[in-house]
Amino acid sequence: MSKWKDVKKVVLAYSGGLDTSIILKWLQTELGAEVVTFTADLGQGEELEPARKKAEMLGIKEIFIEDVREEFVRDFVFPMFRANAVYEGVYLLGTSIARPLISKHLIEIARKTGADAIAHGATGKGNDQVRFELSAYALNPDIKIIAPWRDWSFKSRTHLLEFAEQHQIPVAKDKKGEAPFSVDANLLHSSSEGKVLEDPAVEAPEYVHMRTISPETAPDKATIIKIGFEKGDAVSINGERLSPATLLAKLNDYGRDNGIGRLDLVENRFVGMKSRGVYETPGGTILLAAHRAIESITLDRGAAHLKDELMPRYAELIYYGFWFSPEREMLQAAIDHSQRHVEGEVTLKLYKGNVMVIGRESDKSLYSDKLVTFEDDQGAYDQKDAAGFIKLNALRLRTLAARDRK
């Protein structure tokens, strides 16, 4: 293609799946470019050696497969959870938060290998194209970015399957003998889109769910766990200190076994359309409940309420792909400052899809039983003081009422 005629070497974000395997072959045949592959181990729960073998089969000489699980949770997931970030009230941003990390490594590998372009498999209809490219440009303003879904003649996955068959590219099959749902997975979540899920009125079949058992079949006995926090980050489960990735993986196990973290969502994409997806975020759902609980006793009311006001904007920045933007970094600095005293332990009950906070404690707690007791508080609080407080706060309301009754 003439627009890419100067591109000699491309780093491809490669999963080994249908789209990126076809993109790899397309880059070779249509652009005549040398391709370098990068496969990130984000904790997606699948063996990555098949991706290496597939790349080798397609003639790739430089293959990068990197375990980025700890970096992912430590530098991306945990900072996001300090903000209690959810998009449109429910989505825990599992796909969104992984994209800037992938872009970061694509840019680094391009620099190491002397590549003049990077490529990704995101479609021209979705959010991921924006997330990958905004992140890449923020890190290297001169990088060339190839997005084949916006350039090639294929208009559907049916056409992709035909191309794959022509070039003898193996394609995985699901239980029905068809090409699988469009799936994204990492240590934080998994998502499924496409096929019957494109009709928002139709319930997702059970086999779509990869990370959790159904709440109906979850154990009849509740699971009790304790999560320890330091400076807003989870550091332990049941008293055992764990690395960030190990801790999230363990929470995923607890969530999976108790049917926690399923979400059937129609969301507003950045590009303007609505889309339906089925998400599973077992460990993240538990972590969010625990983090909000420890904040409830360690954050001042004003700071907590301001943080809640800022959260939707922060979540939107991540969803839209602005992780490396100055405004996200500014908000992160404020959020991180708020977490200095967010430490302690939260006890949770996990039962049939539910996460229930049943206890929270901290040496930095602002909760005072002397102030809130219904018994004798030994002079800790003078209830007579409330009269003046109410009178001053009612002043403007009484003034308005006096005017309006005339």
From Swiss-Prot:
Binding residues for ATP: 13-21, 40, 121
Biological processes, Gene Ontology terms: argininosuccinate metabolic process; L-arginine biosynthetic process; urea cycle
GO CC annotations on file: cytoplasm
Catalytic activity: L-citrulline + L-aspartate + ATP = 2-(N(omega)-L-arginino)succinate + AMP + diphosphate + H(+)
Keywords: Amino-acid biosynthesis, Arginine biosynthesis, ATP-binding, Cytoplasm, Ligase, Nucleotide-binding
Quaternary structure and interacting proteins, as annotated: Homotetramer.
Matches recorded under SUPFAM superfamilies: Adenine nucleotide alpha hydrolases-like, Argininosuccinate synthetase, C-terminal domain
Enzyme Commission identifier(s): 6.3.4.5
PROSITE patterns: ARGININOSUCCIN_SYN_1, ARGININOSUCCIN_SYN_2
Record-listed L-citrulline binding positions: 91, 96, 127, 131, 182, 191, 267, 279
Pfam family, one: Arginosuc_synth
Gene Ontology MF: a single term: argininosuccinate synthase activity
PANTHER family membership: ARGININOSUCCINATE SYNTHASE (PTHR11587:SF2)
Protein source organism: Brucella anthropi (strain ATCC 49188 / DSM 6882 / CCUG 24695 / JCM 21032 / LMG 3331 / NBRC 15819 / NCTC 12168 / Alc 37)
Record's keyword annotation contains DNA damage: no
NCBIfam families: argG, PRK00509.1
Keyword Nucleus: no
Identification of the protein by name: Argininosuccinate synthase
Signal peptide from the UniProt entry: none
Pathway membership, UniProt: Amino-acid biosynthesis; L-arginine biosynthesis; L-arginine from L-ornithine and carbamoyl phosphate: step 2/3
Annotated L-aspartate binding sites: 123, 127-128
Family label: Belongs to the argininosuccinate synthase family. Type 1 subfamily.
UniProt-annotated location(s): Cytoplasm
